[in-house]
Amino acid sequence: IVQSSAVAPENPEILAARAAGIPVYKRSEFLGSLLAGKIGIGVAGTHGKTTTTSMIAWMLTALGRDPSYIVGGVIKGLESNAHAGSGDEFVIEADEYDRMFHGLHPQIAVITNMEHDHPDCYPTPQDYHAAFLQYAQSVKVGGVLLVCADDPAVLSLVKDLPASLTNVSYGLQSGSNYYAENIHLVDGY
């Protein structure tokens, strides 16, 4: 049984499962186990997780990679929010609520932005920052952290990272490792 943060430990079904010897896993433990043996790609951030995770899953699918993915919304063009693929990649929306993302340990982690959220879990902005720092440090050895250089809070986080963690910046600023320019919308996209 996978127990989400919304289900109390004293929930009758959880208690019955434990009494019957049925394993009960926290959502973070279960999702982390799904990434085992895969190239885990976790997307975290206060805003943009679903969009960014969807774009990565869609691109990998369009390239014929057949990734596994779990996203917080239905992906346009794939018509699903989850897929068990045969490819090497597993793309997951790395939700910070209740520190779910701490159980993931991806090969590639993305942080889109950070703005203090979920005060029930993170009473202070410093607590929120510390949680994202722990997520960033959970990247597997040899992995990479992709950070949005347009967000001051994310840039502040990068300063707290160990030098051994490879981080690559992206954004709209020319100082980023990768940046977009001359952006044109076609048909509203």
Question: What positions do the PLM features span?
Answer:
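Short polar/acidic secondary-structure junctions
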Residues: 99, 172, 183-185
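Glycine-/charge-enriched secondary-structure boundary and capping motifs
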Residues: 173-176, 188
